[in-house]
Amino acid sequence: MKASLLSKLDILQDRFEELTALLGDAEVISDQAKFRAYSKEYAEVEPIVATYKQVLKVQADLEGAQALLKDNDPDLREMAAEEVREAKEQLAELESSLQRMLLPKDPNDGRNVFLEIRAGTGGDEAAIFSGDLFRMYSRYAERRGWRLEILSENEGEHGGYKEVIARVEGESVYGKLKFESGAHRVQRVPATESQGRIHTSACTVAVLPEPDEQEAIEINPADLRIDTYRSSGAGGQHVNKTDSAIRITHIPSGIVVECQEERSQHKNRARAMSWLSAKLNDQQTSAAANAIASERKLLVGSGDRSERIRTYNFPQGRVTDHRINLTLYSLDEILAGGVEAVIEPLLAEYQADQLAALGE
């Protein structure tokens, strides 16, 4: 391992010993906020230090076995050679595991998200494809045990959505979906096409992490225009009786959010404010993320909404992710919720890039 990594591990080992002492301190135990913070840090550092100790032990075993390779006894040399081989394999696995543990954690990975899907070029066909993408993510959410709720929808004239916004809640939602942001292109023969010509349409997907209440951007109420209107969404006859839908305009940025799916105006307002906070936060962070991605020549992780990231070709049954040159001939399975087949290689590529940066 590189000297820079070893230095980092030595510092972590010292910190681990310090945390162990702190968690046994009566003053810390009596302060719940400090105790929770130190306990969380301990839980993050402990597996790294434990693996590092394993690495040091295997390195010592390897050195001992290598010394025996010079012994006069041929049987002992043969046994030592086998021990050297096994120790080297074990060391490679442990060091790889250790490097992954040292990768910088994205603080947003565990967050819920706001999922925005909008039809782009292609008219009715783009709206229909928006519906296909929304079903794909909905079924993927079901497979992972996530909860998905529609906040706002604008249906297409011939099916699908001109725009659909949903909130997805569950374990590591942003960590899984964060690379889905961008332009998704579809190539297929529309049902109305009599000549059998392939049409190309596009939709944009945006995945925004939902901020915690404590971390939400402070919004000046004077900067907001709040309108209420009658919901056109779910709710049966009730929607005709009250103006429960909410539209919030953030005047300085021009960002508009709408929430119409809840019967309660209060709930719609709370959801809309949370979504607005996510969009304002995204506006602040996306420029920095794009700058980092550009500097390091990254495609995965740039999050550029205008970047064409994926093509779904129906005649060939093909899905191609252009960022990592991944092509899969399993379009039906992916659209049925099997998008993990694309997500996992993207995450692996991103991790490989992080590992390369870690060793720089």
Swiss-Prot record:
Cell compartment(s), UniProt: Cytoplasm
Cystine bridges: none
GO terms for cellular component: cytoplasm
Family matches, as SMART domains: PCRF
N5-methylglutamine: residues bearing it: Q237
PROSITE patterns noted in UniProt: RF_PROK_I
Entry GO MF terms: translation release factor activity, codon specific
Pfam families registered for this protein in UniProt: PCRF, RF-1
Gene3D superfamilies: 3.30.160.20, 3.30.70.1660, 6.10.140.1950
InterPro entries with a match to the protein in the record: PCRF (IPR005139), Pep_chain_release_fac_I (IPR000352), Pep_chain_release_fac_I_sf (IPR045853), Prokaryotic/Mito_RF (IPR050057), RF-1 (IPR004373)
SUPFAM superfamilies: Release factor (SSF75620)
Superkingdom of this protein's organism: Bacteria
Family matches, as HAMAP family: Rel_fac_1
Entry function: Peptide chain release factor 1 directs the termination of translation in response to the peptide chain termination codons UAG and UAA.
Record-stated family: Belongs to the prokaryotic/mitochondrial release factor family.
PANTHER family: LD18447P
Protein name, entry field: Peptide chain release factor 1
Organism: Pseudomonas fluorescens (strain ATCC BAA-477 / NRRL B-23932 / Pf-5)
Gene behind the chain: prfA
